[in-house]
């Protein structure tokens, strides 16, 4: 769906849109040769783009997938058809649609495995694509490792995670003030400084102005108190609301994402996020939410709705 790419162009998450996969690959390689960081959105099926990359003999440095493989009926689009054709098939014959999705996801993950074998650092983003591919006959799907055990868990073990705040005033200047505060308090953290400086230049706000940082629990507490002081002194024009991401330490029980490959075997133990929520409420938090959803339930519910 091209409008999704266009939105990311408007909000500065992408630099360019090229819908022909071969032309997009040529453009990306040209930018790489020039040493220019550049992001290109390609409006096509992921399998089509991966096949073009493989057939050209190109080995990506990094490879992952964020298609909606957690919902093979409503979210995932089989290859060889337009979005409109996919919608028509989904409504006319959902079982046939799921068969086409299963065929495509097997091809999809096989292409990823091929590129991994050639040297691309390949990881799963927790969207259930490995499970769907394995059920579609790709026995080695889990040779692709999850990004949490590979990269993120050491941060979680330190209590570090994504921490966000929103300017209820709607005034970007309030976020600019909190950015300066964060740089004053944590400016010795080189990656944090780089992120804040680049975010100010590159990332457009969507809705209320907001910012996100990866901070440790103690750092979050200190920063929250310091922002309270800004509000009390009138250095920002309205209160700031703080929240955290579902991707965080102690936030989600998800055996193929946040809690994949837990060292103590607790991948699918689901009660500790609830206990954490209760602790937050008892500690005086004013905004606590508990979300529920399983990958299989979502697909089954979507199918039931269509079959009514």
Locate predicted features:
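Short helix/loop capping segments that flank catalytic or ligand/cofactor-binding pockets
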Residues: 4-6, 49-52, 72-74, 132-134, ...
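Short alpha-helical segments and helix-capping/turn motifs at coil-helix boundaries
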Residues: 46-52, 107-111, 224-229, 272-276
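Short, surface-exposed amphipathic charged segments that create phosphate/polyanion-binding patches used
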Residues: 55-57, 77-81, 137, 256-259, ...
């Amino acid at each position: 769906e091209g409008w999704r790419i266009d939105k990311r162009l408007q909000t500065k998450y992408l630099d360019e849109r090229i819908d022909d996969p071969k032309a997009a690959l040529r453009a990306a390689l040209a930018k790489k040769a020039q040493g220019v960081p550049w992001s290109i959105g390609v409006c096509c099926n992921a399998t089509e783009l991966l096949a073009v990359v493989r057939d050209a003999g190109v080995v990506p440095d990094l490879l992952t997938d964020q298609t909606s493989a957690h919902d093979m009926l409503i979210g995932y689009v089989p290859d060889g058809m337009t979005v409109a054709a996919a919608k028509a098939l989904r409504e006319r014959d959902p079982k046939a649609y799921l068969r086409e999705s299963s065929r495509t996801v097997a091809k999809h993950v096989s292409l990823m495995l091929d590129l991994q074998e050639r040297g691309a650092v390949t990881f799963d983003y927790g969207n259930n694509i490995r499970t769907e591919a394995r059920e579609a006959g790709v026995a080695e799907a889990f040779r692709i490792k999850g990004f949490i055990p590979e990269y993120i868990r050491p941060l979680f073990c330190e209590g570090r995670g994504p921490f966000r705040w929103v300017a209820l005033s709607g005034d970007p200047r309030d976020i600019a003030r909190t950015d300066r505060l964060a740089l004053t308090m944590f400016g010795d953290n080189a990656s944090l400084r780089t992120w804040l400086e680049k975010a100010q230049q590159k990332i457009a706000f969507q809705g209320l102005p907001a910012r996100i940082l990866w901070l440790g629990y103690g750092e979050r507490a200190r920063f929250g108190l310091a922002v309270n002081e800004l509000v009390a002194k009138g250095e920002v024009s309205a209160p700031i609301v703080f929240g955290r991401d579902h991707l965080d330490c102690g936030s989600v029980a998800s055996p193929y994402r946040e809690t994949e490959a837990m060292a103590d075997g607790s991948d699918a133990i689901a009660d500790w996020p609830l206990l954490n929520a209760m602790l937050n409420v008892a500690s005086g938090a004013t905004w606590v939410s508990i979300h529920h959803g399983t990958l299989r339930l979502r697909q089954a519910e979507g199918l039931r709705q269509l079959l009514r």
